[in-house]
Amino acid sequence: NMRNKLFILILFVVTLSVSAQNGSEAYTFLRFPTSTRANALGGHTVALVERDPSLIFHNPALLGAEMDGMINLNYMNYISDINVGSALFTKAHGEKGAWGVGATFISYGDIQEVLPDNVVTGASLSAKDISVNGFYSRDLSERWRGGLSLKFLYSGLADYTSIGLCVDAGLSYYNSDKGFSFGFALKN
């Protein structure tokens, strides 16, 4: 009956949210701003509709045919030895669609090796994170646009590596007459 189905659905949703609360997080570099402009605007710009391809790293629905043939390169010397960069190419797909390919990286510089008993070995370790992305967006109407991105992830610390795959989905609304935009993205 309907009551049992609802109970099972609620139990399933609660179980999913509880299992995700394990106290650790992977690929935290995905939260870093990918451009100097996004960083200056607070780090995450899911609703800003501009002809700036770097914004699609935050919301794939911000990609549009108006960005046809654009190349975007960004580099930031973040804090200390941390370097952040991105590269992106976008292309129109008909009148209502667009696609793009891009990559982001973070290099954390040299990290001094310290053993669990606080002994400094004198050796240095390197750490880096890389994301290679594919994007696609489509105008859903005159004011609404949807977008998806697929990310291949690599993370390395000394001799340890990890790879992953994740998807972003976004929606963007823009009313040019009123200068109003709204957007949201489901990330990673």
Where are these regions (language model features)?
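Extreme N-terminus of proteins, especially the signal/transit-peptide cleavage junction
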Residues: 1-2, 19-21
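Positively charged n-region of N-terminal signal peptides that target proteins for export
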Residues: 1-6, 142
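Sec-dependent N-terminal signal peptides
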Residues: 5-16
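Subset of outer-membrane beta-barrel
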Residues: 21-187
